[in-house]
Amino acid sequence: MVGRNSAIAAGVCGALFIGYCIYFDRKRRSDPNFKNRLRERRKKQKLAKERAGLSKLPDLKDAEAVQKFFLEEIQLGEELLAQGDYEKGVDHLTNAIAVCGQPQQLLQVLQQTLPPPVFQMLLTKLPTISQRIVSAQSLAEDDVE
């Protein structure tokens, strides 16, 4: 008797679940803005991921890759600052400083060339970017081991 009641309850729950799936699918298919909203959501997620994530980090043991990354980040940072996009420009410059072999000298040069508010923004972001690079490097080393 108990087994029969359990089977009936499971069957009813399964039927309700399938009914809800059919209802949701029909509602989704009949909505003309569903695809547009889905595209917008994916676009926002992609932009958020680009903002939050670092540029693809080079292998820090490969001097040539680090130098190429450094030069690209400096160039991108300068271009973005020239366009007025200070936030992204500072992000790229902090990436360059984090992988730089002589960060103190680079900071002195940037202090002389950047406006004081932009340089302060750079100094504010530097610890977090450096920490991300160190953690990314340690994760890469863990993968090798």
UniProtKB/Swiss-Prot annotation:
Post-translational modification: Ubiquitinated by PRKN during mitophagy, leading to its degradation and enhancement of mitophagy. Deubiquitinated by USP30.
GO biological process annotation, one example: intracellular protein transport
GO MF annotations, alphabetized: mitochondrion targeting sequence binding; protein-transporting ATPase activity; unfolded protein binding
Paired cysteines (S-S): none
Residue list for modification Phosphoserine: 135, 138
InterPro entries according to UniProt: MAS20, MAS20_rcpt_metazoan, Tom20_dom_sf
Highest taxon above the source species: Eukaryota
Topology term for the membrane: Single-pass membrane protein
GO cellular component labels: cell periphery; migrasome; mitochondria-associated endoplasmic reticulum membrane contact site; mitochondrial envelope; mitochondrial outer membrane; mitochondrial outer membrane translocase complex; mitochondrion; sperm midpiece
Membrane-spanning parts: 7-24
Glycyl lysine isopeptide (Lys-Gly) (interchain with G-Cter in ubiquitin), cross-linked positions: 35, 56, 61, 68
Residue numbers on the Mitochondrial intermembrane membrane side: 1-6
Compartments (UniProt record): Mitochondrion outer membrane
Any one Pfam family match given in the protein's UniProt record, by short name: MAS20
Cytoplasmic side: 25-145
Chief site of localization: mitochondrion
UniProt keyword list: Isopeptide bond, Membrane, Mitochondrion, Mitochondrion outer membrane, Phosphoprotein, Protein transport, Transmembrane, Transmembrane helix, Transport, Ubl conjugation
Keyword Manganese: no
Family to which this protein belongs: Belongs to the Tom20 family.
NCBIfam families hit by this protein: 3a0801s04tom
Subunit structure: Forms part of the preprotein translocase complex of the outer mitochondrial membrane (TOM complex) which consists of at least 7 different proteins (TOMM5, TOMM6, TOMM7, TOMM20, TOMM22, TOMM40 and TOMM70). Interacts with TOM22. Interacts with APEX1. Interacts with TBC1D21. Upon mitochondrial depolarization, interacts with PINK1; the interaction is required for PINK1-TOM-TIM23 supercomplex formation which is critical for PINK1 stabilization at the outer mitochondrial membrane, kinase activation and downstream mitophagy.
Role: Central component of the receptor complex responsible for the recognition and translocation of cytosolically synthesized mitochondrial preproteins. Together with TOM22 functions as the transit peptide receptor at the surface of the mitochondrion outer membrane and facilitates the movement of preproteins into the TOM40 translocation pore. Required for the translocation across the mitochondrial outer membrane of cytochrome P450 monooxygenases.
Protein name: Mitochondrial import receptor subunit TOM20 homolog
Name of encoding gene: Tomm20
